[in-house]
Amino acid sequence: MPYLRDFSLLFWYNESTKTKAVFPMMTQNADKKREQIQMFCMDDLVPQDHLLRLIDQAIDWSFIYDLVIDKYSADNGRPSMDPVMLIKIPFIQYLYGIRSMRQTVKEIEVNVAYRWFLGLEMMDKVPHFSTFGKNYTRRFKDTDLFEQIFSRILQECYKYRLIDPSEVFVDATHVKARANSKKMRKRIADEEALFFEEQLKKEINEDREAHGKKPLKEKKEDPKDPPSCGGSSDGKEEKTVKESTTDPESGWFRKGEHKNVFAYSVQTACDKNGWILGYSVNPGNQHDSRTFISLYDKIKDIGIQTLVADAGYKTPAIAKLLLDDGITPLLPYKRPMTQDGFFKKAEYVYDEYFDCYVCPNDQVLAYHTTNRSGYREYKSCGIVCEGCPYLKQCTESRDHVKVVTRHIWEPYMEKCEDIRHTIGMKEVYAQRKETVERLFGTAKENHGFRYTQMIGKARMEMKVGLTFACMNLKKLAKMIARRGKRGTSKCLLLIKYTLFAPKTRKTLLAC
């Protein structure tokens, strides 16, 4: 007797009697409940442990009204859309990594949790996808609204004492711009002045006068001078740059050996527990050492003791800036750029007392001058070097003169090297991969941070501010939810016990 299968039933068929027995396997009732009319509460449809519910409980969103009150008219015009809802819509987009505002609105239409979070009923019409864009252009453009939202959420994290700013980790990542790499033009652009330009010029002239040289006159930088720490010291220098015709504010960035794209550089600072403390947005073709000051100005007053950064920030200017402000810079070893087969700069020993260098053949390189980039030049005697057995490993100059440069702020770099070799600093630097680099990975993997659909630096700053705000708030909401019915003090003690080192744990338990 054969078995016959249907979509929902298993049949046993008797060929002799032409009968069959039915064995129910599954129930088909998909179409029976579509036309039902039910009464329910929106709040009951959202699980108690849903992320949006936790976020809504973690912060009072009414602070947005105070931030936008001056953007709305009080005595004329028709009623506007609720500003809190207006901000929550892109917040949902960046929280869940939805690719566009149009897709976000489609998701809100069918997602009960999204509607509950926005305060919409099941039959309420969802705002048009262009509503936020129009409000941004007419109300929020050229304002710091989104940075204030980020700061307000960060204050909540400080209120719960979850942030430890003693060790701050700084790094930058690139976000691909919405620009075709084939649609570009070349233009002549002025090099931006460095943040230390005036101070460097003053100290260069003081150094020259101390060596019996005349102060430098105001003129364009000599192209033969070596580059200063992070770039040219003359803000008027011109250079040819590639500019996107789609997004002129983005920068041409070398993503790999064979791939170039237009992108934005996002510099970020976080503490050792992964809380984002600040950010800055710049074109992708600007070096991290040049744009560091824009981020540093935002975080320098939060109580930093040690600032950890990669080799891109290891310049004399940044080392001096941090040490003068009482901050310990933890910067890694930087491989020398010396050509293969030649002596490295470290093999030339500097004599601080006589202010000279001694080469591997025990010959003196005496002080010659201080150039416009802030480097002292030490030169050897060509007649002595002509018969040196190490000449081919030292220089290829026609006059057999070896030139070694030393920045006037080199003592600050030497101090950084001493800090790097201090016991325990190697372990602190290794935390970069667990803090700031992990943040970039999370943002790109879960929050749509690999590329941007926004055009322009201002819109990109809005995206970065809301993305980092939602990452901090997501983390805060989950930690508050773990507290449950326990008191605030016990929860904070548990959090500190989990996050801090074993030695600190004993102190906390003794309290």
Explain the meaning of each model-derived region:
Residues 28-32, 78-80, 122:
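A short, ordered amphipathic alpha-helix with a cationic face
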Residues 35, 48, 61, 82, ...:
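Generic alpha-helical segment signature
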Residues 3, 10-13, 18-21, 496-499:
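Short, positively charged and aromatic/hydrophobic N-terminal segments
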